[in-house]
Amino acid sequence: DRKPQATAIDVIVLGSGVYDQVKHYGRVMGVNVSEKPSNRPEMFARMRDELWWKLREAFQERTIKIPNDDELIGELNLVKFNFARTGSEKLKVEGKRELRDRGVASPNKADAVVLSEYAINRTAMRSYVDWRRHGLRRGSLSWKVA
């Protein structure tokens, strides 16, 4: 049995209750993807947009590997980027409503990968010493989307 050393939970709607129930178990991060982006606010409309873009960059840089899962790969390829409707130059990933309008189900597995990358990067930022002390690595992180 492998226990995750960090878990990221989307705290919007259903995830909020899940987070409240499990946060006392250890390294659990609540993530509100509708908040402002943490980096480059001039480039992204919301944190969700930033996190999806960072995942895109990780694939381009070949710094991430995923399971050979047709459903996951399909979900990752379905979501589109565009510019925010405000007329700004900010990038925005296609929202859940827009996906539904296209007849596409919510990309739950892909969202989970996005959150796991967030957990990895956030944990790594704490410090190299902390990283080494806790022995965190990509394979030891879990992801859930409620």
Predicted feature locations:
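Mg2+-dependent endonuclease catalytic cores in nucleic-acid-processing enzymes, primarily RNase H-like
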Residues: 1-90, 134-146
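Charge-patterned, long linear interaction tracts outside catalytic cores
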Residues: 67-133
